[in-house]
């Protein structure tokens, strides 16, 4: 689970402006952190199907945000996926 300090650190790293919290880069970075936390959760709790549904929803949301960013600005997209280490 992400703490507020972790969340603020991610926002500070990926924000485009001083008060930016909603840009696609920030949203994708926060979703990626939550997805990674849930993947670690599933290593210990394999039968947690309710949370797995939430994980799939987060992955789909992240994919849609990445597709949007790719259509709007390819440079920002490639920079973001290289920073996050995504395999797209």
From Swiss-Prot:
<dbReference type="GO" id="GO:0022627">
    <property type="term" value="C:cytosolic small ribosomal subunit"/>
</dbReference>
<keyword id="KW-0687">Ribonucleoprotein</keyword>
<dbReference type="InterPro" id="IPR005290">
    <property type="entry name" value="Ribosomal_uS15_bac-type"/>
</dbReference>
<protein>
    <recommendedName>
        <fullName>Small ribosomal subunit protein uS15</fullName>
    </recommendedName>
</protein>
<comment type="subunit">
    <text>Part of the 30S ribosomal subunit. Forms a bridge to the 50S subunit in the 70S ribosome, contacting the 23S rRNA.</text>
</comment>
<keyword id="KW-0689">Ribosomal protein</keyword>
<dbReference type="GO" id="GO:0006412">
    <property type="term" value="P:translation"/>
</dbReference>
<dbReference type="GO" id="GO:0019843">
    <property type="term" value="F:rRNA binding"/>
</dbReference>
<dbReference type="GO" id="GO:0003735">
    <property type="term" value="F:structural constituent of ribosome"/>
</dbReference>
<comment type="function">
    <text>One of the primary rRNA binding proteins, it binds directly to 16S rRNA where it helps nucleate assembly of the platform of the 30S subunit by binding and bridging several RNA helices of the 16S rRNA.</text>
</comment>
<keyword id="KW-0699">rRNA-binding</keyword>
<dbReference type="InterPro" id="IPR009068">
    <property type="entry name" value="uS15_NS1_RNA-bd_sf"/>
</dbReference>
<dbReference type="InterPro" id="IPR000589">
    <property type="entry name" value="Ribosomal_uS15"/>
</dbReference>
<comment type="similarity">
    <text>Belongs to the universal ribosomal protein uS15 family.</text>
</comment>
<dbReference type="Pfam" id="PF00312">
    <property type="entry name" value="Ribosomal_S15"/>
</dbReference>
<comment type="function">
    <text>Forms an intersubunit bridge (bridge B4) with the 23S rRNA of the 50S subunit in the ribosome.</text>
</comment>
<keyword id="KW-0694">RNA-binding</keyword>
